[in-house]
């Protein structure tokens, strides 16, 4: 009988202390990337600087094609990040014949800085196809630097 009287106060104290603890949430919060409009423009700026640095030393450099190439490159960069910007629309609505791309993924889980960096690195290899090994290396180096 005495054991009963000692057990109940101890059980009440333990239950009170246990109820004060915050429960652990077994579901971790998912990564939510910031909108592309909240990301710095340093990525675009540095890739543009690299393009102009490489382009001016290439054989057959002419200013007019360089301007056109930069326009195409940046138009593609815009289309890369436009699914993550709610207030902006694709150029397909303004340019006749421009392909419409339906994005079906979750835009909150995409790191837009990485997507834009990958776009520029891949695109530069196509536009600067006659760059020498050192210039190709500088493209790869900038891509790696942007990921840090």
Question: Locations of the language-model features?
Answer:
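Acidic/polar surface patches and capping/hinge elements
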Residues: 21-148
């Amino acid at each position: 009988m005495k054991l009963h009287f000692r057990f109940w106060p101890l059980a009440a104290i333990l239950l009170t202390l246990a109820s004060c603890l915050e429960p652990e949430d077994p579901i971790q919060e998912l990564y939510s990337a910031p909108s592309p409009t909240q990301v710095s423009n340093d990525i675009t700026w540095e890739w543009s600087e690299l393009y102009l640095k490489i382009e001016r030393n290439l054989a057959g450099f002419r200013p007019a094609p360089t301007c056109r190439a930069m326009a195409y490159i940046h138009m593609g960069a815009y289309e890369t990040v436009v699914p993550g910007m709610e207030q902006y629309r694709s150029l397909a609505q303004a340019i006749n014949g421009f392909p419409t791309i339906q994005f079906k993924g979750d835009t909150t889980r995409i790191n837009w800085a990485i997507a834009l960096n990958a776009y520029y690195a891949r695109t530069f290899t196509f536009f600067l196809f006659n760059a020498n090994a050192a210039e190709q290396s500088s493209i790869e180096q900038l891509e790696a630097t942007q990921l840090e």
